[in-house]
A protein has these predicted regions:
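N-terminal lobe/hinge region of extracytoplasmic solute-binding protein
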Residues: 31-81, 112, 182
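Surface-exposed binding/hinge segments that line
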Residues: 89, 123-195
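Structural transition elements
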Residues: 187, 321-360, 376-381
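Ligand/substrate-recognition segments at binding pockets and active sites
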Residues: 198, 237-240, 256, 355-428, ...
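Ligand-site clamp/hinge motif
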Residues: 210-263, 396
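Periplasmic-binding protein-like
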Residues: 289, 293-334, 381-382, 487-495
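Extracytoplasmic/peripheral linker and loop segments enriched in polar/acidic and small residues
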Residues: 347, 398-413, 438-507
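Long beta-strand-rich cores associated with HINT superfamily self-processing modules
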Residues: 503-525
């Protein structure tokens, strides 16, 4: 079925009598922030793909609400030789959705693939001398040096997730894309019901065996699926999505438009939940490979143009409690946040000086292509304010409005703008993704091996390596301050402030876990 046919069928369904309450209670109808563009949570850092990933795939460790790693697929962990050897034993009963058993060699291949793509994974693999399977149940790391953050790396909630998949899938080029989704998680992806642009469906995997003890907390603990189906129905228009939630045609709206939050808060049938307590840092990401932002002087000049309050007001408007200005390269909720170098963002704004600094840096009217995702209200607001800021600074701006899925695909292009490339895009992060240099994609500065935008700074990379080896929290904080100061010199991106978008559910929906949209534990009355 194509998208137009699906929407017509949906309209007909909305006019039909409701089906039996007992049957409806087994179906969770979810409105995602955007459509699912890609199925591979290892090769793609988009949050919508990560959310899909945690439904379908499982991880060796989970992460709880204190940000600590907890065994998930792993039953036992043993360290030997002063922390240079780690032996991870898989628990019994693990099966993939094709009903084949999860074996240690599947996990070894999955870790190796992820380790080539993820920032934290790259650090772990750089410290690893050998990764192997000892029989069907035991994964063995032999390290070059101690890496006490190994469980945290394998169990991180931040993109890119270390998803366990069959060896045949994990053999795929990590810079390619896997076109199927066969995991071992509590839900299986129903490819036959996929309608691009409109619908994604998951069914409870009857072969899933949850952990036998503990409490579900973020991605740790028993993952018990109480619903038979989870249906993601894309509704781009915020008023239509709001109406669907209010009428009971939808159960859960992932990201309500912030201007509708006050009215939703007054609805007795709706519950607003702070899903992510770490906030959403917003950024303007540069393409460091192409003019004009391959020039660090041009990037530095624009720091003086950023008015974080202006960006945040565009996103959240009157909902002042939902945003913060005066934030740097680490979220305000992180122990790594500091005031180091912050005068670059908090001093008096002077656009005349910005223009002079751009000219002194050598900006000569180069075309600047600004990608703006119009189907996500927060990113659309960031993009429009950012494009206007660049124009007021005297830059030659071309706004290219598109959907987020297209931005995700196009940002991979390293071509100049004349050949379909780009100069700037806007996004926001799950705050936990930026909590430390270990997981902070935006602060990786390893050139073309890094995240989209491809910042290249040996100094930032060296400081990150120092941080990974820091012996305690005070040492980590001191290094994080130095990293932030260096970031204000290299300017991998512009920090635009941070905001929080509550998630909205019907009151009869219970058991929603904090952290990110997770579908185990959720029940409908």
């Amino acid at each position: 079925m194509n998208r137009r046919g699906f929407l017509a069928a949906t309209a007909t369904t909305l006019a039909m009598p409701r089906i039996a309450r007992s049957q409806q209670a087994r179906i969770l109808r979810f409105i995602p922030q955007v459509d699912l563009p890609l199925l591979d949570p290892v090769a793609n850092s988009a949050y919508i793909t990560r959310n899909h990933g945690f439904a379908v795939f499982d991880t060796l460790f989970g992460q709880d609400s204190t940000f600590a790693a907890q065994p998930q697929m792993v039953d036992g962990v043993a360290t030997e030789a002063d922390g240079l050897t780690w032996r991870l034993t898989l628990r019994d009963g693990l099966r993939f959705h094709d009903n084949t058993p999860v074996l240690a060699r599947d996990c070894v291949a999955s870790i190796a693939r992820w380790g080539k793509r993820d920032a934290f994974g790259q650090a772990l693999m750089a410290a690893t001398n050998e990764l192997s399977a000892d029989g069907d149940k035991v994964i063995v790391f032999r390290l070059k040096r101690p890496f006490p953050l190994l469980p945290a790396a394998l169990g991180k909630v931040a993109s890119n997730m270390c998803a366990m998949m069959p060896e045949r899938m994990a053999a795929t080029d990590p810079f390619g894309i896997i076109a199927e989704a066969v995991g071992s998680g509590p839900f299986r992806y129903v490819a036959s019901e996929r309608v691009p642009g409109a619908r994604t469906v998951y069914e409870r995997f009857e072969g899933y065996v949850p952990r036998p003890s503990g409490t579900a907390d973020w991605t740790s603990g028993p993952k018990i699926a109480h619903v038979d189906r989870v249906e993601w129905n894309v509704i781009p228009d915020a008023f239509t999505a709001s109406a669907a939630l209010r009428s009971g045609q939808a159960d859960w709206w992932q990201e309500p438009a912030l201007d509708l939050v006050p009215s939703l808060r007054k609805d007795a049938n709706i519950r607003l939940i702070e899903l992510d307590p770490t906030g959403a840092p917003a950024i303007m990401r540069f393409n460091h490979l192409q003019p004009p932002f391959n020039n660090p002087g041009v990037r530095r000049a624009l720091l003086g143009a950023v008015d974080q309050a202006e960006f945040m007001e565009a996103v959240a408007g009157a909902e002042r409690e939902l945003w913060k200005a005066g934030t740097g390269y680490f979220p305000s909720s992180s122990t790594m946040a500091s005031t180091a170098g912050m005068a670059a963002l908090t001093s008096k704004r002077d656009m005349a000086k910005v223009k002079a600094d751009l000219a002194a840096a050598g900006y000569n009217g180069e075309r600047t292509v600004v990608m703006v995702a119009t189907d996500l209200p927060a990113l659309a607001a960031l993009g429009l304010v950012g494009a206007d800021m660049l124009k007021r600074a005297g830059m030659n701006v071309e706004v290219q409005a598109t959907d987020w899925g297209s931005v995700i695909q196009r940002r991979a292009s390293k071509e100049p703008v004349e050949k379909g490339g780009w100069s700037v895009f806007f996004t926001s992060f799950f705050g936990l993704d930026q909590f430390t240099p270990a997981t902070h994609l935006g602060l990786r500065a390893n050139g073309t091996a890094g995240w989209f935008g491809w910042c290249d700074s040996p100094k930032l990379e060296a400081l990150r390596e120092e941080w990974l080896r820091a012996p305690d929290l005070p040492a980590q904080q001191a290094l994080a301050a130095r990293i932030q100061e260096q970031a204000f010199t290299d300017v991998p991106y512009l920090p635009l402030g941070e905001y929080s978008i509550p998630t909205a559910t019907r009151k009869e929906v219970t058991g929603v876990l904090k952290g990110l949209p997770l579908f185990w534990g959720v029940q409908k009355a």
